[in-house]
């Protein structure tokens, strides 16, 4: 069975690296991007199975990325918002995200969430 491909989109290098290492250590194929423009480029190359998306980023924010990504042809990966905003649920609903996780987050919580969206039913 092929590895699930996860795209981590966050302008915070330390968070991106932490999530990448954590997911890589349990067998996921991880790609990263520091903003929405980079993320759109990666989606054309990698076709992720799940996108973990920060909302507040320079160049192109999470809202614009999500809208642009969903307007593209082809199958779309679930999007899970990862944000420090206290209204994480509302942020996720604004872009019709499939789920959300508040920062700071627990590693087990992150791994459980990723597993839920990448495990075939």
Task: Please give the residue ranges for each predicted region.
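Alpha4 helix (beta4-alpha4-beta5 surface) of REC/receiver domains from two-component response regulators
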Residues: 64, 86-101, 112
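Active-site residues of response regulator receiver
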Residues: 54
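Hydrophobic/aromatic residues positioned on beta-strands within the core alpha/beta folds
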Residues: 80-83
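Charged docking surfaces used in two-component/phosphorelay signaling
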Residues: 17-25
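C-terminal output helix
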Residues: 105-115
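Acidic, metal-coordinating helix/loop segments flanking the phosphotransfer/catalytic sites
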Residues: 32-50
């Amino acid at each position: 069975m092929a590895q699930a491909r996860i795209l981590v989109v966050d302008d915070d290098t330390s968070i991106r690296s932490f999530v990448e290492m954590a997911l890589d250590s349990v067998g996921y194929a991880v790609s990263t991007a520091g903003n929405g423009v980079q993320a759109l480029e990666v989606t054309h190359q990698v076709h992720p199975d799940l996108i973990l998306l920060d909302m507040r980023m320079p160049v192109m924010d999470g809202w614009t990325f999500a809208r642009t990504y969903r307007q593209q042809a082809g199958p779309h990966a679930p999007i899970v918002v990862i944000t420090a905003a206290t209204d994480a649920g509302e942020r996720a609903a604004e872009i019709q995200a499939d789920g959300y996780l508040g920062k700071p987050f627990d590693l087990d919580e992150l791994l459980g969430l990723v597993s839920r969206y990448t495990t075939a039913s």
